[in-house]
Amino acid sequence: MKQNSLNVKQKKLSKIAFSHVGCEKNLVDTEHMQGLLHKEGYEVDSNINDANVVVVNTCSFIETAREESIRKILEYTNQGKEVIVAGCMAQHFKDELIKEIPEIKGLVGTGDYQKIAKVLDRVEKGEIVNEVSKIPEFIADEEMPRFVDKNKFVAYLRIAEGCNYNCAFCIIPKLRGPQRSRTIESILSEAKSLAKKGIQEIILISQITTNYGQDIYGKPSLAKLLNELSKVPIPWIRIHYAYPTGLTDEVIRAFKDSKNIVPYFDLPLQHSHPDVLKSMNRPWQASLNESILEKIREEIPSAVLRTSLIVGFPGEKKEHFEHLLQFLDRHKFDHVGVFIFSPEEGTAAFHLPNKVSPEVAEARKDNVISVQQNISREKNQIYVGSKMKIMVEQISDNNELIGRSYNFAPEIDGTVILSVKEKIDLKNYIGKFVEANISFADEYDLYGETIKIL
């Protein structure tokens, strides 16, 4: 790992490790906390077994994420580690966590991770710390130390934090606070710094990326940001969490005009039927779904479309679900993530009537997966026989290269698996782009052979 700042203070006694649960926004928080602690003289270790303090950065988006977070907390407290709980569960259950698990030494809210060093100092003095602001307001800028994993060539770049929407199923606005954007200058500065560190791909993230700048510039400013970022020498710039309302002509033009902004559209649409979307408190979306998808395909034929969907939402009838399946068949997304509705206390959907049974919801999820697998297989077959630009990220146990083309985002999509004829050290390929012949495809991955390093 590398850190942004070299101004490291005198070494402290505690050895700190981090355990991360949840999304990439949480990951960025973790990287900042690691950087801050290193700057203050703490030894930050990736090996939890060697650490005496573990910071568990938690997720509270859905029940399964909370269960995983609690499992990790209990695992480390049972090992005798001093545990500090950070992130969304600390924000969500700031009064309950320490009562239920008294072994926890401290809590750090989603708007308070910049205080992690002071929290740890207080914990080392024997204090039980509850550092959770009622309303998160902080967002890190390019000046805050951050660890960037030297073994990876992808970095997430947060352009805003928080959300002003109130989707009926979502607890995030209560956990992350209102939207607050960074300035274009701040984002550009960090992007340039990441480029100097050898990062080959940056992924722009926020709760709603297409709403970027509304709070500080008086209007959404993603198009202007993209135009500026396109000048930064990073081969791939990807955008996650784009909403249909924000995909204006200017934003789509920025995708078209920029060589390094990949035509990959991550659109968390959640559903297709107007009745379900209205219940989700997203009534504006139904009329836009069809038109924006058609517009993207028309303007950018090479566009890759990903969406995420919720099935089993209260009141979702059979005809609503059939509408969703027809929607998938009609628009043929490249990638789809599907989740069963999770009732979250504190959200409007928690009290909605007409609950869908778990058995029906599970069957609907399986149905969506089956339909999408067939679509994805057909989409991937298009690449067979073509040459593609691949970023190589690792070596498999079978001595093959594993990487991605622009149409695959890390972690959530497939990979490209390549054989190599040349008798050279495979490590020479890591972090580089290669040209490859694609010879086979399944519903998730592409397979082929390297031609040359680009």
From Swiss-Prot:
Top-level taxonomic group:
Bacteria
Q: Name one GO molecular function term.
A: 4 iron, 4 sulfur cluster binding
- Binding annotation for [4Fe-4S] cluster 1: 23, 59, 88
Leading EC class:
transferase
Q: Which UniProt keywords apply?
A: 4Fe-4S, Cytoplasm, Iron, Iron-sulfur, Metal-binding, S-adenosyl-L-methionine, Transferase
Chain ranges of the Radical SAM core domain? 149-378
Q: Does the keyword 4Fe-4S apply?
A: yes
Cofactor note text: Binds 2 [4Fe-4S] clusters. One cluster is coordinated with 3 cysteines and an exchangeable S-adenosyl-L-methionine.
Q: Where in the cell is it found?
A: Cytoplasm
The question of whether 4Fe-4S is a record keyword is answered with: yes
Q: What is its EC number?
A: 2.8.4.4
One GO term of the cellular component aspect?
A: cytosol
> In what residue span(s) does the MTTase N-terminal domain sit?
14-125
Q: Where does [4Fe-4S] cluster 2 bind?
A: 163, 167, 170
Q: What cofactor(s) does the depicted protein rely on?
A: [4Fe-4S] cluster
Q: Which InterPro entries match?
A: Elp3/MiaA/NifB-like_rSAM, Methylthiotransferase, Methylthiotransferase_CS, Methylthiotransferase_N, Methylthiotransferase_N_sf, NA-bd_OB-fold, Ribosomal_uS12_MeSTrfase_RimO, rSAM
Q: GO terms for biological process?
A: tRNA modification
Task: From the UniProt record, list the reaction(s) this protein catalyses.
Answer: L-aspartate(89)-[ribosomal protein uS12]-hydrogen + (sulfur carrier)-SH + AH2 + 2 S-adenosyl-L-methionine = 3-methylsulfanyl-L-aspartate(89)-[ribosomal protein uS12]-hydrogen + (sulfur carrier)-H + 5'-deoxyadenosine + L-methionine + A + S-adenosyl-L-homocysteine + 2 H(+)
Residue ranges of every copy of the TRAM domain listed in the record: 381-452
Q: What CDD domains does its record include?
A: Radical_SAM
What's the stated role of this polypeptide?
Catalyzes the methylthiolation of an aspartic acid residue of ribosomal protein uS12.
Instruction: Please give the family membership noted in the entry.
Output: Belongs to the methylthiotransferase family. RimO subfamily.
Q: Which HAMAP family match?
A: MTTase_RimO
Report the NCBIfam families cross-referenced here. 30S ribosomal protein S12 methylthiotransferase RimO, MiaB/RimO family radical SAM methylthiotransferase
Spell out the protein name for this chain. Answer: Ribosomal protein uS12 methylthiotransferase RimO
To which species is this protein native?
Prochlorococcus marinus (strain MIT 9301)
